[in-house]
Amino acid sequence: LFDQTISEFQFVEQRIWIKDFINYKVGVDGISILFILLTTFITPLCVISINNSIKESLSEFLIAVLIMESFMIGVFCSLDLVIFYLFFEAGLIPMFLIIGIWGGARRVYSAFKFFLYTLLGSVLMLVAIISIYWLNGTTDIVELYESGIDIKYQNLLWLAFFSSFAVKTPMWPVHTWLPDAHVEAPTAGSVLLAAILLKMAGYGFIRFSLGLFPVASEIFTPLIYTLSVIAIIFTSFIALMQEDMKKLIAYSSVAHMGYVTLGIFTIQQQGIEGSIIQMISHGLVSAALFLCVGVVYDRMHSRLINTYGGIVSIVPKYSILFMVFTLAALGLPGTSGFVGEFLILMGAFKDNFLVAVIASIGVIIGAAYMLWLYKRVIFGKLINNDLKQMIDLNKSEVFILSCLAVPTLFFGFYPEPLINTIEVSISDLIDEYNFRLAGRL
């Protein structure tokens, strides 16, 4: 069983792949295990949900989804930089196919935009990994933690990794691929993209930016703060202007990931814990919101907000579950969304009061666009007569959304299992960070 009381990697497996260069080495710690559990929880729900939305080449679609799951698990348990990079980039291929083959009218454009943005962002990371091998003679993450990386090279290496993680997060201003990808992707593709794929970058910031380049992370923290605050405020206002439900949720994802990057670089226990909990919560809530959009799209073939309104009495089960996830997305106390945001802001107030105050404004704007979305879709007058024929959630849809609602509410009232799992690993990471910073290595 996994031991929460130690920070070392557990269940480690190692095999020689290319002698004196690459080892296949995998393992988990308190940070990575939560993302692996999230991946293995969300993917089966995606598989169950596709029975209505995918009409052609269903078996091929399932193959792409399951291959993608394998690559994402590989990312979270990799203990070698080369293995991490291979899994990190290989995950692009099935998502590219999911968008490009089973997506909407502009699927080819969106698929190539997604692929090129994320691939080009990762080229510098490959160069950095090769440089690290040249400098240290190893790409083993555990060995690199122990030996440290020369301070003379940390800034350039940090920027190279940042170029990849910033695009994948995505951070402002390299976020424009995400709304297009979400709009054109099938529902299951949007769920995987928002719930898991974006988390690989947040995980990368914690594992590599803080773990390998502490001196550079300290230097570039003001840059991260600036970009995070812009993402939180700017994309929240953009979300308020959207008429497409998927685009609104996509922009809200950029804002939520802005909180994640802010919390990570506070280098505070509460901040990093909050960022991880926020990523887990966002994985659950964003998956549910995209599934909710998929439900009404399957029935009415429209994602436009003004198509709907006045359906609360027609689809009561849908209205209740949609309300749960809307409130979780805006961070209502008692939902998992509140726990992450609260801890992040606690960490931010300890490190930089002004940044924390500005980021807090995003909470208000977030509540505005989520409540505005819910009000226009669920309440109001029934103008569109076609909505009278709308069918409420079937048993399969109730099951899927309930599976997401239960942990969303449970961790909102009792986040202790999440905190206990990550606490020791984060504490050890911060101690090592401060030790390296004090020694300037």
List PLM regions with ranges:
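Transmembrane alpha-helical segments of multi-pass membrane proteins
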Residues: 62-72
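Hydrophobic transmembrane alpha-helices and their helix-loop junctions in integral membrane proteins
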Residues: 45-53, 70-82, 95-378
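Helix-to-loop transition at the C-terminal end of transmembrane segments
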Residues: 2-9, 133-138, 415-420
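Cytoplasmic/organellar membrane-interface segments at the starts of transmembrane helices
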Residues: 315-317, 370-441
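Transmembrane helix-loop-helix hairpins at membrane boundaries of multipass inner-membrane proteins
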Residues: 1-63, 142, 428
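Hydrophobic alpha-helical membrane-insertion segments
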Residues: 1-2, 118-127, 328, 364, ...
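Core segments of transmembrane alpha-helices
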Residues: 40, 340, 400-404
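Short phosphate-coordinating micro-motif centered on Lys-Gly-acidic
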Residues: 89
